[in-house]
C-alpha cells in the first residue's frame, strides 16, 4: 500500500510550519487592513474563460482543467488569484467609481512547478489597488510590499524595477507581429542574447539597436539616463522612463534599488511598471508586482490597476524558525475539578493541553502545568 504518497511538488504543511504560516498570514492581512485594503475570498474553482484570458498561454498551461458535470462547461482550478480579484472589482463591486483597495490570501494550484524547489500549491497572498492610474498608486503598492516583507522578518531587501510598456512601445513602433513580439518577449525574459540578435536581425533601425540594448540597460538609477540616449524617443519610452525616475526618487535611501529594462518576468496581463523584491542569498524573487491596467475589461469594466503578490510557502523557507509558544499541561485526573480554571486560562489565550497518558513536556509542547494549591489551582514549571 502506497496510498499515503502525494503527487510530485505537493506537500503537507506540518504543525510547526502551519502555525508559522497562519501567524504570518494573519499579520500580513492585518497590515493590509490598516492600509485600507478589504479582504476578498474568491472561489478555488471557476469557469476557465474567467480564469484565463485569450492569448495568455503561460497561465493557460499552469491551470488544471476539468469538466463541470452540472453545466457541461470547462472549469479550472485557479492558478492565479489576480484575475479573480479583477472580476470582483469589475462585476461585483461595479458600483464603486473611486479607488478600490482589495487583498486576498489563498491556495492556488499549478499543473507544473515554476521551479525545482517550488510547490504546485502555492499559498498566494497579495494586495491590489484599482481606479487610479497615477504613479503614486504604484509607489503605495511598492511601499506596502516592502513593509509586508520587513514585518515578516526579511532583512536587507533589494528592489528590482522594470517597465513592460517600454518593450511593447518598441515592438509596436517596429511593426512586429503579435507572434514575433511574443517570441522576442520570451527571449528577453530568458536573457538570451544570441536569440535576441537572431530574432531582430531583419528589424529596421533604430528599433533593432534598441532591442539589442535592452539587456544591457540594468543597474542603479544612473542607467535611466543611459537609456534615454540609447532608446528612440517614443511616447511609451518617455513615459516609462519618467515613471521609473519617479520610483528612483521615491525609494532613494529606502531600499537597495536597481533597474532592468529587460526585466519582463511578469504576467501576460501586466501593462506598465513591474517590480520584484529579492532577499540576500536567494536568486528567485520573493514577491512580485506591477501595473495591469484594464485587466477587468473582459469582465465589462476597464480600470487602472496595480498590485503585488507573494507565495507564503516560498517566503517561509527563508525566514528563521520561530520558537513556538508553549502550553500548560493539566492532568486528566484533575478534571472536572480544574475545568473552570482551564476555561479561564483558555479565555486569556493560553494553550491548555489535557494529558491522558503522562507524556513528556516535549511531546505535549508544554513548559508549565496546572497543579492543585491550597486556595485552588496554580501554575508550576513542567520539564
UniProtKB/Swiss-Prot annotation:
Keyword Nucleotide-binding applies = no
Annotated GO biological process: histidyl-tRNA aminoacylation; L-histidine biosynthetic process
Q: Which UniProt keywords apply?
A: Amino-acid biosynthesis, Cytoplasm, Histidine biosynthesis
Q: Name one Pfam family in it.
A: tRNA-synt_His
Which GO MF terms are attached to this record?
A: histidine-tRNA ligase activity
Please give the superkingdom of this protein's source.
Bacteria
The record's listing under InterPro entries reads:
aa-tRNA-synth_II/BPL/LPL, HisRS-like_core, HisRS/HisZ, HisZ
Localized where? Cytoplasm
Q: In which pathway does it act?
A: Amino-acid biosynthesis; L-histidine biosynthesis; L-histidine from 5-phospho-alpha-D-ribose 1-diphosphate: step 1/9
Gene Ontology cellular-component terms listed: cytoplasm
What role does it play?
Answer: Required for the first step of histidine biosynthesis. May allow the feedback regulation of ATP phosphoribosyltransferase activity by histidine.
Task: State the oligomer form and interacting partners.
Answer: Heteromultimer composed of HisG and HisZ subunits.
- Which family does the record assign? Belongs to the class-II aminoacyl-tRNA synthetase family. HisZ subfamily.
Anything further noted? This function is generally fulfilled by the C-terminal part of HisG, which is missing in some bacteria such as this one.
Protein name, per record: ATP phosphoribosyltransferase regulatory subunit
Query: What lineage does UniProt assign to this protein's organism?
Result: Bacteria, Pseudomonadati, Pseudomonadota, Betaproteobacteria, Neisseriales
Amino acid at each position: 500500500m502506497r496510498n499515503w504518497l502525494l503527487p510530485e511538488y505537493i506537500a503537507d504543511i506540518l504543525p510547526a510550519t502551519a502555525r508559522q504560516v497562519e501567524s504570518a498570514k494573519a499579520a500580513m492581512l492585518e497590515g493590509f487592513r490598516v492600509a485600507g485594503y478589504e479582504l476578498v475570498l474568491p472561489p478555488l474553482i471557476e469557469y476557465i474563460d474567467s480564469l484565463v484570458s485569450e492569448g495568455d498561454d503561460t497561465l493557460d498551461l499552469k491551470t488544471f482543467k476539468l469538466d463541470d458535470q452540472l453545466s457541461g462547461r470547462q472549469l479550472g482550478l485557479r492558478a492565479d488569484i489576480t484575475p479573480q480579484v479583477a472580476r470582483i472589482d469589475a462585476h461585483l463591486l461595479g458600483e464603486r467609481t473611486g479607488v478600490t483597495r482589495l487583498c486576498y490570501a489563498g491556495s492556488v494550484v499549478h499543473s507544473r512547478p515554476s521551479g525545482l524547489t517550488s510547490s504546485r500549491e502555492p499559498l498566494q497572498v497579495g494586495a491590489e489597488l484599482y481606479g487610479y492610474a497615477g504613479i503614486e498608486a504604484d509607489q503605495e503598492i511598492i511601499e506596502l510590499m516592502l513593509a509586508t516583507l520587513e514585518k515578516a522578518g526579511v532583512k536587507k531587501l533589494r528592489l528590482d524595477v522594470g517597465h513592460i510598456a517600454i518593450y511593447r512601445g518598441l515592438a509596436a513602433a517596429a511593426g512586429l507581429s503579435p507572434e514575433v513580439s511574443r517570441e522576442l518577449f520570451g527571449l528577453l525574459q530568458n536573457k538570451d542574447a544570441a536569440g535576441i540578435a537572431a530574432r531582430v536581425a531583419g528589424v529596421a533601425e533604430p528599433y533593432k539597436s534598441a532591442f539589442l540594448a535592452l539587456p544591457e540597460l540594468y543597474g542603479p538609477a544612473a542607467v535611466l539616463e543611459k537609456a534615454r540616449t540609447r532608446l528612440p524617443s517614443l511616447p511609451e519610452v518617455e513615459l516609462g522612463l519618467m515613471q521609473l525616475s519617479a520610483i528612483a526618487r521615491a525609494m532613494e535611501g529606502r531600499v537597495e534599488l536597481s533597474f532592468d529594462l529587460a526585466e519582463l518576468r511578469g504576467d501576460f496581463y501586466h501593462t506598465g511598471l513591474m517590480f520584484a523584491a529579492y532577499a540576500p542569498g536567494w536568486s528567485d524573487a520573493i514577491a512580485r508586482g506591477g501595473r495591469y491596467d484594464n485587466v477587468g475589461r473582459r469582465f465589462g469594466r476597464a480600470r487602472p490597476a496595480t498590485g503585488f503578490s507573494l507565495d507564503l510557502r516560498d517566503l517561509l523557507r527563508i525566514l528563521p524558525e520561530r520558537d513556538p509558544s508553549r502550553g500548560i499541561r493539566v492532568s486528566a485526573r484533575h478534571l472536572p475539578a480544574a475545568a473552570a480554571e482551564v476555561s479561564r486560562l483558555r479565555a486569556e489565550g493560553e494553550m491548555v493541553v489535557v494529558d491522558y497518558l503522562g507524556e513528556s513536556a516535549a511531546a505535549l509542547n508544554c513548559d508549565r502545568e496546572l497543579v492543585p494549591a491550597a486556595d485552588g489551582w496554580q501554575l508550576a514549571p513542567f520539564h
